[in-house]
């Protein structure tokens, strides 16, 4: 009604094509849980999401009820922490061609980084799975999470996803001619492209009625 938008003109890495959905404060967010090797933009987004809506406390209650070994993590991501790798490649040693020693590939760029970070961040010890199939990653994660519950592999699943802004995504979609010059208008007859954004979100998926004292939200 107020015609306010979360999209702003792209100001990332000198890229001026289109508009972006940029999460405020993520650059200054400090991850205080888990090894420092997990420090990257994508995991910072995930950490911020864990602090919303009492989610981390809900997971702790589930761990108390089921046990840490029975809580799985199934999440989707298409880019993971690739921004850290992009920055590392821009700062390779001129003599050796090696990236900086501060670059931790397994904790940032690796697609399993997000999943491992969440397990350590939230204290779970059950099965882990990362789904990465482009824009459908998090949707597919919900499908796999339900299958795991039905198969009895776990009693609860942390499911969702995170994707963060990076050069590859911004320049990639622009090179395909898919980025709108202005804020995207997906249902408008005159729509002319997309706007790239970043976000993270998670839910705790359980079997219906497993904990009668906990109200079902969906």
What residues fall within each predicted segment?
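Conserved active-site "lid/cap" helical segment
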Residues: 1-76, 81-84
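Condensing-enzyme catalytic core mediating Claisen C-C bond formation in acyl metabolism
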Residues: 1-19, 183-218
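Active-site nucleophile and cofactor-binding loops and adjacent substrate-binding regions
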Residues: 12-14, 43-49, 104-112, 129-137, ...
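Active-site-proximal alpha-helical scaffold in enzymes
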Residues: 59, 111-115, 119-161, 195-212
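Active-site-proximal gating segment of KS-fold condensing enzymes and close homologs
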Residues: 77-129
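Glycine-rich beta-alpha junction loops
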Residues: 77-79, 162-166, 209
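Short, well-ordered, mixed-charge alpha-helical segments that flank or form enzyme active sites
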Residues: 81-85, 139-140, 165-169
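Acyl-CoA/ACP chain-elongation machinery
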Residues: 153-175, 180-191
């Amino acid at each position: 009604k107020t015609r306010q938008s979360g999209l702003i003109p792209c100001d990332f890495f000198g890229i001026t094509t289109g508009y972006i959905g940029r999460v405020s404060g993520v650059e200054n967010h400090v991850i205080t849980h888990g090894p420092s090797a997990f420090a990257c933009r994508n995991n910072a987004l995930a950490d911020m999401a864990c602090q919303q809506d009492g989610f981390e406390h809900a997971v702790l209650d589930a761990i108390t009820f089921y046990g840490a070994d029975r809580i799985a993590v199934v999440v989707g991501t298409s880019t993971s922490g690739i921004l850290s790798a992009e920055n590392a490649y821009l700062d390779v040693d001129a003599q050796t061609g090696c990236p900086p020693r501060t670059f931790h590939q397994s904790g940032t760029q690796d697609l399993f980084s997000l999943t491992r970070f969440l397990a350590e961040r939230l204290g779970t010890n059950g099965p882990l799975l990362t789904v990465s199939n482009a824009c459908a990653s998090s949707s597919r994660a919900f499908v796999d999470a339900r299958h795991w519950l039905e198969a009895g592999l776990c009693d609860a699943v942390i499911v969702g996803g995170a994707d963060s802004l990076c050069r590859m995504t911004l320049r990639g979609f622009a090179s395909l001619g898919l980025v709108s010059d202005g804020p995207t208008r997906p249902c408008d007859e005159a729509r002319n492209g997309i706007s790239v954004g970043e976000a993270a979100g998670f839910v705790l998926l359980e079997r219906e009625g497993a904990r009668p004292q906990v109200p079902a939200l969906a």
